[in-house]
C-alpha cells in the first residue's frame, strides 16, 4: 500500500487533461471477450483497476498490451475459466465478467465483487435479469455460478432501481442472446452510451442507450473493427474542477464533455464559482467568495454520487451552513471523520452530512478508505496548512489517471511513497 504526502497551501495553475472514463473502461475491458477478434481501445486511463482487469484476462488466456493510452485485447484463444476469488474480489467492476462470460459461453463462475466500502451494493437486479434471460444462478460458497445450458433468450426485464451495474451486465449478457431483450428502467449514464457504442461498432444491435428503455437484438457474432476511443471521465473532471475552484489561480481543465456534467456545473455556478465553459474544456478562475449550497445525489442526469466527496472540501470554503444527502449510498461518509482530523467543521446526523465554513484546514495523517473519499482528502490536503499524509493512497490510484504527474504539473508539491 502507498501513502501520499502533500505540502499544502500552494496555489495551482496551468492546465490538466482528463483521461478516459474509469466507469466505461472497467466495463469495456470485460466486454472485449465477447468479440471473436482483436479489440483496440484508445484513451484508456492509467489506473490500477485497468491493470487488475488485464491481469484477470491473462488468466483466461486473453492476451493484451497497454502502450501509451492504447490497449489491444485479443480474445481469440480465450478459455472459459472460473474466476472464484483472489484478483476478482479486489475490484467491484470484476462483476462485469458475469455478463460477459455468460454472453460468450453461456456460463460463468465469478467471485462476489469487492471494491470500495461505501455501503451495501447488492447484485439482486443482475441476478433477476440473468434468470429472465434463461440462466440458472446459484451462490456457491461466495462465488456466483451462472449456467444457461439451453442458451440465452431475449426477455423483457424491468429493473427495480436504475442500477448502472445491472444495466451494463444485462447488456453484455443479452447482446449475443437469441431474440430481443428489452431493459426497462435502465440507467442512463453516459458510460452506458459509450459501452453500447463500443458493442455496436463490433456488430451488436443496441438501441436506446442513454434512455430508460434499452432494446437489444441478439447477434451470433461480434468482431472488433475500428479503434474505440473511451469518453472523458466526468468524475475525474469534476474532481479537478473542485480542486481548481478551491485552491486554483486559474486552471484550464481539458478533454471534457460538459453536457455530461450539467448537474455538477449547475451546483458550482450556484456556489459562485467563476468558469468559462467551452466545447471541450473549462477554465476555472479564482473564486474567493463562495456561497454554501445543499447537495443531493441522484441517478444520472442528477448530481453524481461519485462527486459528492470531491466537492466537499470546496463546500468547506463557502460561507454558511450546507448539507450533503447521498440518496444512492447513504453510508458514503468515511471521509467525514478524516476531515474532522484536519479541522473541518463537519458532522453526520442520520446519514446527512452537515457542513460549516472552515477558515483553514490543518495538515494531518488521514486514511483514504476508498477512491472518491481519497480524492476528497487529496483536495483538502492541497488546501491545508502544513503537510498532509494520506495512508491507503493506493485507493486513489485505482480511480485517478496519472494523478501525481497531473498534480505536480499544476504546481502542487505532492509525492507517492511506499508505506
UniProtKB/Swiss-Prot annotation:
The keyword Transmembrane does not apply. It is found in: Cytoplasm. Its EC number is 2.5.1.7. Pathway: Cell wall biogenesis; peptidoglycan biosynthesis. It is an enzyme of class 2 (transferase). Phosphoenolpyruvate binds at residues 22-23. The active site is at residue 116. Pfam families: EPSP_synthase. It comes from the Bacteria. GO terms for biological process: cell division; cell wall organization; peptidoglycan biosynthetic process; regulation of cell shape; UDP-N-acetylgalactosamine biosynthetic process. UDP-N-acetyl-alpha-D-glucosamine binds at residues 92, 121-125, 306, 328. Transmembrane segments: none annotated. Belongs to the EPSP synthase family. MurA subfamily. This is UDP-N-acetylglucosamine 1-carboxyvinyltransferase 2.
Amino acid at each position: 500500500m502507498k501513502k501520499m504526502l502533500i505540502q499544502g497551501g500552494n496555489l495551482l495553475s496551468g492546465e490538466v487533461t482528463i483521461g478516459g472514463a474509469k466507469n466505461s473502461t472497467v466495463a469495456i475491458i470485460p466486454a472485449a471477450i465477447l468479440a471473436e477478434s482483436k479489440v483496440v481501445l484508445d484513451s484508456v486511463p492509467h489506473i490500477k483497476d485497468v491493470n487488475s482487469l488485464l491481469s484477470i484476462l491473462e488468466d483466461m488466456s486473453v492476451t493484451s498490451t497497454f502502450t501509451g493510452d492504447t490497449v489491444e485485447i485479443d480474445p481469440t484463444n480465450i478459455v472459459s475459466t472460473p474466476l472464484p476469488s483472489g484478483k476478482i474480489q479486489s475490484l467491484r467492476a470484476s462483476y462485469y465478467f458475469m455478463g460477459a462470460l455468460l454472453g460468450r459461453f453461456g456460463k460463468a463462475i465469478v467471485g462476489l465483487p469487492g471494491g470500495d466500502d461505501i455501503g451495501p451494493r447488492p447484485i439482486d437486479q443482475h441476478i433477476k435479469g440473468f434468470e429472465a434471460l434463461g440462466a440458472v444462478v446459484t451462490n456457491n460458497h461466495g462465488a456466483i455460478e451462472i449456467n444457461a445450458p439451453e442458451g440465452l433468450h431475449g426477455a423483457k426485464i424491468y429493473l427495480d432501481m436504475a442500477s448502472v451495474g445491472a444495466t451494463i451486465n444485462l447488456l453484455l449478457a443479452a447482446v449475443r442472446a437469441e431474440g430481443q431483450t428489452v431493459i426497462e428502467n435502465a440507467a442512463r449514464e453516459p458510460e452506458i452510451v459509450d459501452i453500447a457504442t463500443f458493442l455496436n461498432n463490433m456488430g451488436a444491435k443496441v438501441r436506446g442507450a442513454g434512455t430508460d428503455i434499452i432494446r437489444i437484438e441478439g447477434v451470433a457474432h461480434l468482431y472488433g473493427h475500428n479503434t474505440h476511443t473511451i469518453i472523458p471521465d466526468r468524475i475525474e473532471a469534476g474532481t479537478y474542477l473542485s480542486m481548481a475552484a478551491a485552491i486554483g489561480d486559474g486552471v484550464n481543465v481539458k478533454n471534457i464533455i460538459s453536457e455530461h456534467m450539467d448537474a455538477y456545473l449547475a451546483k458550482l455556478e450556484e456556489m459562485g464559482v467563476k468558469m468559462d465553459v467551452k466545447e471541450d474544456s473549462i477554465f476555472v478562475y479564482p473564486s474567493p467568495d463562495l456561497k454554501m449550497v445543499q447537495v443531493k445525489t441522484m441517478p444520472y442526469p442528477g448530481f453524481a454520487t461519485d462527486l459528492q466527496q470531491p466537492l466537499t472540501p470546496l463546500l468547506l470554503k463557502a460561507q454558511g451552513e450546507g448539507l450533503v444527502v447521498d440518496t444512492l449510498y447513504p453510508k458514503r461518509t468515511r471521509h467525514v471523520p478524516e476531515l474532522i482530523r484536519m479541522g473541518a467543521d463537519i458532522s453526520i446526523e442520520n446519514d446527512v452530512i452537515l457542513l460549516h465554513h472552515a477558515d483553514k484546514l490543518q495538515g494531518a495523517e488521514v486514511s483514504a478508505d476508498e477512491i472518491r473519499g481519497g480524492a476528497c482528502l487529496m483536495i483538502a490536503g492541497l488546501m491545508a496548512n502544513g503537510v498532509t499524509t494520506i495512508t491507503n493512497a493506493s485507493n486513489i490510484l485505482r480511480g485517478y489517471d496519472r494523478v501525481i504527474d497531473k498534480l505536480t504539473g499544476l504546481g502542487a508539491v505532492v509525492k507517492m511513497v511506499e508505506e
